[in-house]
């Protein structure tokens, strides 16, 4: 894997810097590395593809070295270099695709394609000169079963979940109380509602709670907490739990009271915040517990009192909500996030070449399914294919 990365890094630098008019002295070190790559690869044969509709391709390496010059690089020099670069780039691209479409239930962190296994041989280590990629660094750690750490921005840690629970219900669905939520990606939005605006509740207050368990532990997380849930701030028609009917939700938004968010690890509270909004942090956690209250306003203008009558019908429904958004965090496991295209890169290649469903990944690389059942086998394979996707993205956009 590290050899594949160094190949890609050398080719990217060569493609960017070996251009007509450049002083040879400015790229002499790069050309030496480029020639070392050619010397190492010459005389070797590889085969890629042969799975799904990914075509079989044979690769043979027999290229001349780039020479030295005291002057600027001319058009002939650059054209010779370009022909070599283009062939190598095509080769790396196909090795990456061949690796991204393969999976294994055992030792999925190790190379799975014949071409990448061959590149892992000792003689190709002479190519290796740069392991500065976070993915490569973590792949090497995971390969040795040592602690890894990926930094993510808006990590897709929450499987998609959108539903509701009713703490008070009746067949007519005209005086409901409960919670509804939407968890997806890096965000939780949860709302508590009471059609009667807590008129018969103790101290005219309703208590709500929402608990979310993560599939992986996050550390050093920067989080935004807001006293609102905008996705539940407009009227909607909702299917009943049994699917037999629908009910109407017409929210009027109040500010939540006694808001508390707890971050827990293995059942132990690590961080707690009370009535604190904006940016907060959590050291390490695998569970988030949100609790908040809906309090009937003790003093209301006539206009507000008209919204919340003392008896049915309740045409407007008192609602309070919270939004929790993970802006950045560190995780030992690889995840999809907002700043990278690895999941899309892997999925698009697998779809384009009609790769059959294997023993590890769900059909279509469905992320909700994948993260919900994030087994060690999936973790190993996902880290490998994401690492390869990061290498491919250096050369192919």
From Swiss-Prot:
A Gene Ontology biological process term: fusion of virus membrane with host plasma membrane
Key word Calcium present: yes
PTM info: The N-terminus is blocked. Sumoylated with SUMO1 and SUMO2. Sumoylation of viral proteins seems to have a positive role on viral replication.
Pfam families: Rota_Capsid_VP6
Highest taxon, organism lineage: Viruses
Keyword Ubl conjugation annotated: yes
Positions contributing to Zn(2+) binding: 153
Annotated positions binding Ca(2+): 266, 286
Subcellular location: Virion
Similarity remark: Belongs to the rotavirus VP6 family.
Oligomeric and partner information: Homotrimer. Interacts with the inner capsid protein VP2. Interacts with the outer capsid glycoprotein VP7. Interacts with the outer capsid protein VP5*.
Miscellaneous: The VP6 trimer contains a zinc ion located at the center of the molecule. The zinc ion is not essential for either trimerization or transcription activity of the DLP. Zinc-depleted VP6 has an increased sensitivity to proteases.
Protein name: Intermediate capsid protein VP6
């Amino acid at each position: 894997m590290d050899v594949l990365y160094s190949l890609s890094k050398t080719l990217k630098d060569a493609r960017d810097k070996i251009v007509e008019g450049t002083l040879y002295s400015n790229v002499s070190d790069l050309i030496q590395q480029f020639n070392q790559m050619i010397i190492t690869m010459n005389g070797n044969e590889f085969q890629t593809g042969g799975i799904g509709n990914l075509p079989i391709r044979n690769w043979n390496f027999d290229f001349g070295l780039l020479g030295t010059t005291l002057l600027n690089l001319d058009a002939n020099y650059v054209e010779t270099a370009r022909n070599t670069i283009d062939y190598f780039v095509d080769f790396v691209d196909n090795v990456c695709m061949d690796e991204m479409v393969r999976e294994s239930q055992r030792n999925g962190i190790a190379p799975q394609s014949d071409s990448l296994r061959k590149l892992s041989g000792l003689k190709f280590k002479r190519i290796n000169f740069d392991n500065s990629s976070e993915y490569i660094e973590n792949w090497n750690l995971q390969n040795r079963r040592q602690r890894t750490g990926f930094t993510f921005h808006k990590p897709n840690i929450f499987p998609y979940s959108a539903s509701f629970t009713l703490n008070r219900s009746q067949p007519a669905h005209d005086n409901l109380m409960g919670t509804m939520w939407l968890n997806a990606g890096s965000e939780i939005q949860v709302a508590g509602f009471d059609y009667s605006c807590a008129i018969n509740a103790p101290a005219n207050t309703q208590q709500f709670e929402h608990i979310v368990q993560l599939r992986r532990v996050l550390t050093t997380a920067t989080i935004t907490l807001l006293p609102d849930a905008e996705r539940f701030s407009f009227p909607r028609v909702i299917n009943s739990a049994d699917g037999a009917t629908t009910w109407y939700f017409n929210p009027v938004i109040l500010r939540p009271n006694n808001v508390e968010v707890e971050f827990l690890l293995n059942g132990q509270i690590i961080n707690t915040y009370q009535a604190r909004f904006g940016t907060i942090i959590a050291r390490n956690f695998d569970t988030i517990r949100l609790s908040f209250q809906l309090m009937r306003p003790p003093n209301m203008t006539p206009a507000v009192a008209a919204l919340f009558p003392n008896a049915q019908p309740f045409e407007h429904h008192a609602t309070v909500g919270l939004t929790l958004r993970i802006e950045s965090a560190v995780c030992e496991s690889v995840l999809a996030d907002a700043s990278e295209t690895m999941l899309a890169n892997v999925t698009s290649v697998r779809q384009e070449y009609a790769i059959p469903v294997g023993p590890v990944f769900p059909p279509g690389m469905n992320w909700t399914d994948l993260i919900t059942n994030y087994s060690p086998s999936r973790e190993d394979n996902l880290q490998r294919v994401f690492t390869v996707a990061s290498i491919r993205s250096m050369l192919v956009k």
